[in-house]
């Protein structure tokens, strides 16, 4: 299991939002390549990048920055989400050195697109499921749908999806702990590996996720930037064979 640092990109800076509200942001850095290098130095084995402007615009806005990070970290697996709505965009990112591309809104609006992407780019597609009270949200979390997160995950069980990134919006950026029950439920219901996101605040949250069936990793943002979670300590905890 991996602890995966999040680098959220907004207006060329690394920020953290609260519950996805673009106006409620905290800027942590304006040197994104250096931020990525910092987390690598701290022991990161994968990076999670989100183009926040892209998520709202419906098209990538931070392509050059993502390319620069990928070029600076050629051996590091990188996953990117936000505004990915075409096969051309996926191809562009993979050719630039990104390892995994996260499809979110488009997965809800056009599930066939995910299946097509999995056929074209096998092993490189992650579905991002963002949910408020168990219901899927789209377009940078601006719209909450009537689609259940578990039903959407099940829809892609046989599509060839690499994994699911599951974000509990109510917990995201709020430092209130991770929703272990819903995350594990999603993994068990879908049969797909799940990366937990939203609310990973301290080592207790990491302990609660450790050993849970189907949990591939946990994304953490505000906690590692504000210091309530030490990335290296968290990964060491997960690497131990004991709880």
Curated annotation (Swiss-Prot):
List localization entries: Cytoplasm
What EC number(s) does the entry state?
A: 5.3.1.16
Q: Name one GO biological process term.
A: L-histidine biosynthetic process
Enzymatic reactions = 1-(5-phospho-beta-D-ribosyl)-5-[(5-phospho-beta-D-ribosylamino)methylideneamino]imidazole-4-carboxamide = 5-[(5-phospho-1-deoxy-D-ribulos-1-ylimino)methylamino]-1-(5-phospho-beta-D-ribosyl)imidazole-4-carboxamide
Q: Which Pfam families does this UniProt record tie to the protein?
A: His_biosynth
- Entry GO CC: cytoplasm
Record keywords: Amino-acid biosynthesis, Cytoplasm, Histidine biosynthesis, Isomerase
Under which main EC class is this enzyme filed? isomerase
Give a GO molecular function annotation for the protein: 1-(5-phosphoribosyl)-5-[(5-phosphoribosylamino)methylideneamino]imidazole-4-carboxamide isomerase activity
According to its UniProt record, which residues of this chain constitute the active site?
8, 130
What residue range is the signal peptide?
none
Domain of life per record: Bacteria
- Cited HAMAP family: HisA
Similarity annotation: Belongs to the HisA/HisF family.
| Official protein name in the record | 1-(5-phosphoribosyl)-5-[(5-phosphoribosylamino)methylideneamino] imidazole-4-carboxamide isomerase
Question: Per the UniProt entry, what species is this protein from, by scientific name?
Answer: Acinetobacter baumannii (strain SDF)
């Amino acid at each position: 299991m991996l602890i995966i640092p999040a680098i959220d990109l907004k207006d060329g800076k690394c920020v953290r939002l609260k519950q996805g509200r673009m106006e409620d942001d905290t800027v942590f850095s304006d040197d994104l390549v250096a931020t990525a290098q910092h987390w690598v130095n701290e022991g990161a084995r994968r990076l999670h990048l989100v183009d926040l402007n892209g998520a709202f615009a419906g098209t990538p806005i931070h392509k050059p920055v993502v390319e620069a990070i990928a070029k600076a970290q050629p051996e590091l697996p990188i996953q990117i989400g936000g505004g990915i709505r075409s096969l051309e965009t996926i191809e562009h990112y993979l050719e630039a050195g990104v390892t995994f591309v996260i499809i979110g809104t488009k997965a809800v609006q056009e599930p066939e697109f995910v299946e097509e992407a999995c056929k074209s780019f096998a092993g490189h597609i992650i579905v991002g499921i963002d949910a408020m009270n168990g219901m899927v949200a789209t377009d940078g979390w601006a719209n909450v749908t009537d689609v259940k997160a578990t039903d959407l995950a099940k829809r892609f069980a046989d599509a060839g999806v690499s994994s699911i990134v599951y974000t509990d919006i109510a917990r995201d950026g709020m430092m209130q702990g991770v929703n272990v029950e819903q995350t594990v439920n999603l993994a068990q219901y879908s049969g797909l590996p799940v990366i937990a996101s939203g609310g990973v605040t301290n080592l207790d949250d990491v302990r609660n996720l450790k050993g849970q069936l189907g949990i591939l990793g946990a994304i953490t943002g505000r906690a590692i930037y504000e210091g309530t979670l030490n990335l290296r300590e968290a990964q060491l905890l997960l690497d131990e064979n004991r709880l």
